[in-house]
C-alpha cells in the first residue's frame, strides 16, 4: 500500500515539472551548447543535469504559485496542487530543492552559466508569475526571457561568457513564445477570462492577437537571416531552419485573415515543433563547422 502511495506521489511531483515543456527547454540548452562549439562531454553532461533540475524546479515553483488560477480553469484544475494531491508547501519545497541543486551544478561549469540559470528563475517566478502575469498581456515577453535562459546557459557553458550571438539566439525563443502561448489562450479564451488572467486574446481580442503573432513570426525570420549574415551560424542552419519558419508564417497569415477559436488549437500544435527544429538546426550547423575545421 505504501509503495502505491509513493508511486502516486512521485507521479504527481513529476507532473509539477511539465516534462514535455521541460524537455523542449532542455533541448534548446543542449543544442545551443553544441552550436556554440561545445565539445567537452563532461561539460555537456553537467549542463544537461543542471538544466534538467533547474528548469524542473522553476516550473514546479510556478505551478505552486499559480494554483489559484489553475483551480478556476477546467483545463488545469486537475493539476496536482489545485486538486489537493500535492500541497503548495510540498510543491514549493520540491521546486526550490531541484533549482538549488541545478544552480549549484551550473556554477561548477562556470559563473556565466549559473548567471543564466538564475536569470531564468528570476524572470519566470519574480517578474512573470508574481508580477506581470495577472496585470498585463505583455507578461509573456518576460516569460519568454525565462524560456530563453536555457539557451543562454548552453552558450555560456560552451564559450565561458554570454555574447551578442547568444542573446540573438535567445531572442528566437522570445519571438516564438507568442505563438506558443497566445494560440492556446485563444482556444481557451473563456477559461482565461473567467480566471481574470489578462492574456492578449482576452484584452485585445482574437483578431489583433493573431496579427501580433504574424509580426513576431516575421521578426523571427529576420533574426534567423541576421544570425546567418552576421556569421555566428552558417548555411546549414539557414537551410534547415528557414523552411519550417516560413511555412509557419504562411499558416499564421492565413489564420489572421480568418481567425477562429477552433482553429487556434491546430495552430498551437503547428507552432510546437518550430522552436525544436530551429535549435536542432543550430546544433547541426555547429557539428558541421567542427567537422569542417578538423
Swiss-Prot record:
Q: Which Gene Ontology cellular component terms are annotated? A: plasma membrane
Locate the transmembrane regions by residue number: 19-39, 41-61, 89-109, 111-131, 138-158, 166-186, 218-238, 272-292
- As recorded in UniProt, its EC number(s) are 2.5.1.141
Protein topology in the membrane: Multi-pass membrane protein
InterPro entries, A to Z: Protohaem_IX_farnesylTrfase (IPR006369), UbiA_prenyltransferase (IPR000537), UbiA_prenylTrfase_CS (IPR030470), UbiA_sf (IPR044878)
Which Gene3D superfamilies does this entry report, sorted A to Z?
UbiA prenyltransferase
* Associated pathway: Porphyrin-containing compound metabolism; heme O biosynthesis; heme O from protoheme: step 1/1
Q: Which BP terms does GO give this entry?
A: heme biosynthetic process; heme O biosynthetic process
Output the Gene Ontology terms for molecular function: protoheme IX farnesyltransferase activity
UniProt key word Cytoplasm: no
The entry's keywords: Cell membrane, Heme biosynthesis, Membrane, Transferase, Transmembrane, Transmembrane helix
The reaction(s) catalysed by this protein are: heme b + (2E,6E)-farnesyl diphosphate + H2O = Fe(II)-heme o + diphosphate
Where does this protein reside within or beyond the cell? Cell membrane
Q: Which residues form the signal peptide?
A: none
Please state which protein family the record places this protein in. Answer: Belongs to the UbiA prenyltransferase family. Protoheme IX farnesyltransferase subfamily.
Q: What else is known?
A: Carbon 2 of the heme B porphyrin ring is defined according to the Fischer nomenclature.
- Outline what the protein does: Converts heme B (protoheme IX) to heme O by substitution of the vinyl group on carbon 2 of heme B porphyrin ring with a hydroxyethyl farnesyl side group.
Entry's PANTHER family? PROTOHEME IX FARNESYLTRANSFERASE, MITOCHONDRIAL
Q: Under what name is this protein listed? A: Protoheme IX farnesyltransferase
What does the organism's lineage look like at the top? Archaea, Thermoproteota, Candidatus Korarchaeia, Candidatus Korarchaeales, Candidatus Korarchaeaceae
Which gene name belongs to this protein? ctaB
Amino acid at each position: 500500500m505504501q509503495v502505491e502511495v509513493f508511486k502516486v506521489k512521485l507521479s504527481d511531483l513529476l507532473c509539477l515539472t511539465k516534462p514535455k515543456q521541460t524537455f523542449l527547454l532542455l533541448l534548446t540548452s543542449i543544442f545551443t551548447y553544441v552550436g556554440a562549439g561545445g565539445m567537452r562531454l563532461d561539460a555537456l553532461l553537467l549542463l544537461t543535469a543542471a538544466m534538467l533540475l533547474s528548469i524542473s524546479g522553476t516550473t514546479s515553483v510556478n505551478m505552486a504559485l499559480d494554483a489559484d488560477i489553475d483551480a478556476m480553469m477546467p483545463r488545469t484544475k486537475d493539476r496536482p496542487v489545485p486538486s489537493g494531491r500535492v500541497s503548495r508547501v510540498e510543491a514549493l519545497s520540491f521546486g526550490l530543492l531541484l533549482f538549488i541543486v541545478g544552480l549549484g551544478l551550473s556554477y561548477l561549469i562556470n559563473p556565466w552559466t549559473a548567471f543564466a540559470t538564475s536569470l531564468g528563475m528570476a524572470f519566470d517566478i519574480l517578474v512573470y508569475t508574481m508580477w506581470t502575469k495577472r496585470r498585463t498581456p505583455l507578461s509573456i515577453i518576460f516569460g519568454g526571457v525565462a524560456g530563453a535562459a536555457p539557451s543562454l546557459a548552453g552558450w555560456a557553458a560552451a564559450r565561458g561568457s554570454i555574447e551578442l550571438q547568444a542573446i540573438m539566439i535567445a531572442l528566437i525563443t522570445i519571438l516564438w513564445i507568442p505563438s506558443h502561448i497566445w494560440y492556446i489562450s485563444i482556444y481557451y479564451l473563456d477559461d482565461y477570462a473567467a480566471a481574470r488572467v489578462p492574456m492578449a486574446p482576452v484584452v485585445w481580442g482574437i483578431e489583433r492577437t493573431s496579427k501580433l503573432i504574424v509580426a513576431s513570426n516575421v521578426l523571427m525570420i529576420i533574426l534567423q537571416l541576421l544570425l546567418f549574415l552576421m556569421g555566428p551560424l552558417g548555411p546549414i542552419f539557414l537551410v534547415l531552419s528557414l523552411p519550417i519558419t516560413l511555412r509557419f508564417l504562411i499558416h499564421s497569415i492565413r489564420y489572421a485573415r480568418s481567425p477562429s477559436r477552433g482553429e487556434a488549437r491546430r495552430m498551437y500544435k503547428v507552432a510546437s515543433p518550430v522552436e525544436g527544429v530551429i535549435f536542432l538546426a543550430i546544433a547541426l550547423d555547429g557539428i558541421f563547422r567542427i567537422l569542417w575545421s578538423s
